[in-house]
Regions:
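Intrinsically disordered, low-complexity, charge-rich terminal extensions
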Residues: 1-247
Length: 247
């Protein structure tokens, strides 16, 4: 816990059993039992055997551990999940909800349509002064499969501008740099991907000895959440605040 911020880590442990290993063991048991009893096993009997095979193999299975950080901003009533996919984020929130008994949260949505704002930034060259557009974007058409991905390409390119000005495409993803502090990809669903802090930020707490892991961890958490909170505040202001939900 730091100030108004709470950090939690959800840990998921999975036992990895290759399907072919289970099938081979199951086939051997079915064949052995059918020969012994001189009859074909019923579907329910095969399922019972399969359950038994899985239970016997589990102690020898590989274990896959997955950790998902959840940062709660109690002042602004926001829950941030560090996850590469929405499924992983939902799993972490489901665990938190189960632990608390209740967790009435919904994905953050801005009042103004993000793709419209992102497109205006590029077409009208009116990106906020605290942001720099990098040479990476995704342009989306009206059809789901109509996507153009731009990388290492100036977005003021005439062909790109023509597509945006004609309304054939909108900017659905845009790589940005915020105040020489952080780079990230902003998505039209309001998620931030590929966050990377500048070296100057990463080295700010370098004076804390590596051996003092807890102190360094706490200092980094306070520093980075402070930066992200300010960024999110800027984005909320630029996109018209949080969308009002009816009902």
């Amino acid at each position: 816990l730091a100030s108004d911020f709470i950090l939690l880590v959800a840990k998921k442990e999975e036992k990895m059993l290759p399907a072919n290993v289970v099938k081979r063991e199951l086939d051997e048991r079915i064949e052995s039992l059918e020969q012994k009893e001189n009859r074909k096993l019923k579907k329910t009997e095969k399922q019972t055997l399969k359950d038994d095979v899985v239970m016997n193999l589990l102690p020898r299975a590989f274990t896959k551990n997955q950790q998902t950080a959840v940062w709660i901003d109690t002042e602004n009533n926001l829950v941030h999940v560090d996850a590469a996919s929405s499924k992983r984020a939902e799993d972490a929130l489901a665990l938190l909800r189960k632990s608390l008994g209740s967790l009435p949260v919904v994905p953050l949505a801005f009042a103004n349509e993000p793709s419209t704002i992102l497109t205006d930034w590029i077409v009208q060259e009116k990106i906020p002064h605290w942001l720099v557009a990098l040479e990476e974007a995704e342009l989306r058409g009206s059809q789901e499969d109509s996507v153009i991905r731009c990388k290492k390409q100036p977005l003021e390119n005439e062909e790109i501008l023509a597509l945006l000005q004609d309304g054939k495409k909108v900017v659905s993803k845009l790589a940005l740099e915020w105040e020489d502090t952080l780079t990230f990809v902003f998505n039209e669903d309001c998620t931030l991907k590929r966050l990377k802090f500048a070296d100057a930020v990463r080295e700010k707490n370098a004076d804390i000895l590596k051996e003092d892991y807890a102190q360094r961890f706490d200092a980094d958490f306070v520093l980075m959440t402070g930066i992200l909170s300010k960024l999110i505040e800027n984005l909320l202001d630029e996109f018209g605040g949080e969308k009002v939900r009816l009902g």
